[in-house]
From Swiss-Prot:
The lineage of its organism: Eukaryota, Metazoa, Chordata, Craniata, Vertebrata. One of its GO terms (cellular component) is nucleus. Residues 336-356 are annotated as: Basic motif. It comes from the Eukaryota. Coiled coil: none annotated. Residues 298-319, 437-449 have a biased composition (Low complexity). InterPro entries: bZIP (IPR004827), bZIP_sf (IPR046347), bZIP_transcription_factors (IPR051027), TF_CRE-BP1-typ (IPR016378), Znf_C2H2_sf (IPR036236), Znf_C2H2_type (IPR013087). Belongs to the bZIP family. ATF subfamily. Binds DNA as a dimer and can form a homodimer in the absence of DNA. Can form a heterodimer with JUN. Heterodimerization is essential for its transcriptional activity. Residues 334-397 form the bZIP domain. This is Cyclic AMP-dependent transcription factor ATF-2.
Amino acid sequence: MSDDKPFLCTAPGCGQRFTNEDHLAVHKHKHEMTLKFGPARNDSVIVADQTPTPTRFLKNCEEVGLFNELASPFENEFKKASEDDIKKMPLDLSPLATPIIRNKIEEPSVVETTHQDSPLPHPESTTNDEKEVSLQQTAQPTSTIVRPASLQVPNVLLTSSDSSVIIQQAIPSPTSSTVITQAPSSNRPIVPVPGPFPLLLHLPNGQTMPVAIPASITNSNVHVPAAVPLVRPVTMVPSIPGIPGPSSPQPVQSEAKLRLKAALTQQHPQVTNGDTAKGHPSGLVRTQSEEPRPQSLQQPATSTTETPASPAQPTQQTPNTGGRRRRAANEDPDEKRRKFLERNRAAASRCRQKRKVWVQSLEKKAEDLSSLNGQLQNEVTLLRNEVAQLKQLLLAHKDCPVTAMQKKSGYHTADKDDSSEDISVPSSPHTEAIQHSSVSTSNGVSSTSKAEAVATSVLTQLADQSSEPGLPQVGVVPPSQAQPSGS
């Protein structure tokens, strides 16, 4: 047995032997490809049936973290973390550029968010009594609450030794997002650092997508009053359904980002009352939609920050319309085949109907022709019978002197151009019968009527001869017979 299969598998617990090395290599490859999942969790319920179903396979892949190791363009900047860690992951804000903090009382100012001429609807949203940006004119530190338009990022707590920013997660519907800027009473200039600030975006469908927010500040000499923890949510209707990113280092548009933008484009934001906060002296938050330029968040007396709008926003309607065109063009194959078969059946039905009408017309025409043919055959048969009867009648009266006299007088006068033999010498009765037969058959119906007239006249003459016996003997005697009698 060992001589027939000399190649032994060296895997632990497997003692199979194979005839050649190729089979052994394939067998070893199966050992290498065997999936080895980690131990089951202690809190999971033990199920007796351990059949590897697709659901269990996906669950095991999630447990071992197979789906979290997908390649992304930001894998050098971020590390692998779970969803709970993403929501609570602290990031250091020390390299970020923040406004200069000074212990100075400032007057209330207006926070205005503009972004130029967008093809999307132009919602204007203002805050109400509870959603104001209030600045206190006291020596106590105050805080400024600013929410950029449609900034949709996960709940990330960003802390540093001097300031902290809390950005709440925004869902596709317009919700409140609060940015709390807290600063101590010390004055400290912060130098802006070039480059985008990375964040992890948690999409509503459960995926995680990294984004970059620019950290440049246009005005470094702005003043922010000393802050006291004052948190009031500012609700603004998003005018740009995208995530602002840097103008030059724009990341590659991934499929998840395009899906997110399409979902946000379909979302129709509700416009809140825009006249409630115009009379308040503390501040006014407005959102204007104009031409797609870099979106700037302007706070004249507090801070100034520019966040360029996403360049892919003005063309968001094009992929949707193209998708609708593709869906219209690419119909269901079953529906297309059903319509094709229906058209074929209708065409075949029309063809069968036309053929049926044509065949019926041919049958009717054939019946008419057959009936006409039968009538003609009957007429021909009757005519033949009549001709035969007339022939018999002529043969019966071939020796009649009246017939001979009528022939001499009638046929002689009618046929003057005939030979002299016919005029001088009377023809034989057989020849006369043949001539009568040929005339009657050639002339058809007219010859038949003529023969009837001749027969009628002959019968009349015979009747006259029977009533006057002396006359026919004298008048009917041929000259050949009269000469010998005279001699």
